[in-house]
Amino acid sequence: MVPAEQYLAPKEQEPTHVSQSDGLPSPRVLVMHRLAARLSRLARPAKGFVSQPEPRTIGSFARGRQLVAGNFQFAGRLVEAKGVPIWDLATGDGRFDDEIHGFRWLDDLAAVSDGPARERAQAWAFGWIDRYGTGKGPGWLPELTGRRLIRWVNHAIFLLNGQSPAATRAFFRSLGRQTRFLSQRWRAAPAGLPRIEALTGLIYAGLSLTGLERYVAPASAALARECRDRVDAEGGIPSRNPEELLEVLTLLTWAASALSGSGRAPERDHLAAIARIAPTLRALRQADGGLARFHGGERGLDGWLDQALAEAHALSGGKALTAHGLAMGYGRLSAGRTTVVIDAGAPPK
């Protein structure tokens, strides 16, 4: 293990992604997660893909190049460790560990998609299977497992290119185990974004992997309930964090598109939440294409907001979605290329 203190940059960087948890789960919940993770070894391995949802994740080419160079920037911390596997970084920072176990960095390596990037993606993915695939380690939380499954399904060709039959079997065996874990533990994910992420991962796996379609209908119904309970009538969420709301919209459009692409209709409450959120985010869009920054949210990756809004527009049947009055408690003024967004709402819950 490599002590992170040897590699810390002089100045911590701004967080890359929105934190999805207000704290650690209770000890009892963690014990139940650990038990379910260990029991996931009883799951039947998936044999292959029925179909793969079209990859919709957006990675950063620049961050991907930094990862290849050995610069790991997660959770507001930059660790410089050239030639060190990602699982050997010992930061002692739970948020850092959550981000690497969620595999969102796989989007960045796929954005580079050259030989060195693919080598690292494969080494780190199969390294995770070797070290943690039997239910060990901090990555067995429902929201992290859902996030990881989405990336593994999206980038399966990237990860499996040139792999041996034994490695391919290990990959599908791990997908089956993680799907079983999610099916048992998604309810324990915190309500809102973490639970939506867990359910979206379960839907992706159920639609994509042979023999797992039984999980799709219950997960789709649960996602619709979460939409009804957590997205208010104005398309807002309790945290009032614009970037977190963009995360929610992104996951909902991914799930809806995957369901539609497989010939299944998304639930009415699911589509209604997308229709409510989109105009709220459009009102929070700055002239440069980024989000207004409030309550811990950042502007988002270039092109992320526009892609999410375009997908929401397509799912709405091409209907114009426009906010009227305040949007999640924010007011907007605009003239030409100048926009002003004002927080005029109650404090976040």
Feature locations, PLM:
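Aromatic-lined, polymer-binding surfaces characteristic
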Residues: 93-274
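Preference for long, amphipathic alpha-helical scaffolds in soluble/luminal domains
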Residues: 57-81, 178-181, 185, 218, ...
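Pocket-edge structural micro-motifs
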Residues: 76, 89, 107, 334-335, ...
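Asp/Glu-centered strand-loop micro-motifs enriched in Gly/Pro and often flanked by an aromatic residue
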Residues: 74-77, 81-96, 110-112
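CBM-like, beta-strand-rich accessory domains located in the C-terminal region of large
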Residues: 2-3, 88, 94, 146
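Carbohydrate-active enzyme catalytic cores, enriched for enzymes
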Residues: 232-349
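Extreme N-terminal leader/anchor segments
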Residues: 1-82
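Sequence-level motif detector for i,i+2 pairs with an aromatic at +2
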Residues: 67-69, 82-84, 100, 328, ...
